[in-house]
């Protein structure tokens, strides 16, 4: 089963038809399972509001299987920060991906350069 953890940057690019969104769509469609923290929904809806886009992102997020950690992610957060600095929301998404797949067999999809670098250093594949 091909699975990927999806960072908000990918769905924001698709929602706003940003440069590279066609590549992102193809990549998303190539996976059988798409995973993300429910933080993705908040980030996507906030971006839509900021840009005054009235469209409901429900269709974009309908393919996502939500991950709800049942414990603090202190260990995963420490692992990410020991690898390198990323901002808070980017850190959370990487930590949740480690929670879901500590063996790093899933892909980590992001358009954020720094987050991609750290995800690769952690051993995740990408787009």
Where are these regions (language model features)?
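Short active-site oxyanion
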Residues: 1-2, 31-34, 63-65, 102-107
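Short coil/turn segments
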Residues: 15-16, 40, 85-86
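Hydrophobic beta-strand scaffold residues
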Residues: 34, 123-126
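Active-site neighborhoods of divalent-metal-dependent phosphate/nucleic-acid chemistry enzymes
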Residues: 66-117, 124
């Amino acid at each position: 089963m091909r699975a990927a953890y999806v960072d908000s940057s990918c769905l924001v690019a698709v929602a706003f038809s940003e440069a590279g969104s066609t590549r992102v769509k193809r990549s998303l469609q190539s996976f059988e399972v798409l995973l993300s923290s429910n933080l993705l929904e908040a980030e996507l809806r906030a971006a839509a509001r900021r840009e005054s886009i009235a469209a409901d992102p429900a269709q974009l997020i309908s393919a996502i299987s939500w991950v709800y950690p049942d414990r603090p992610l202190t260990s995963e957060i420490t692992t990410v920060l020991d690898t390198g600095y990323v901002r808070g929301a980017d850190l959370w998404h990487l930590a949740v991906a480690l929670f879901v797949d500590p063996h790093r067999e899933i892909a980590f999809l992001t358009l954020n350069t720094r987050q991609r670098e750290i995800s690769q250093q952690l051993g995740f594949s990408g787009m």
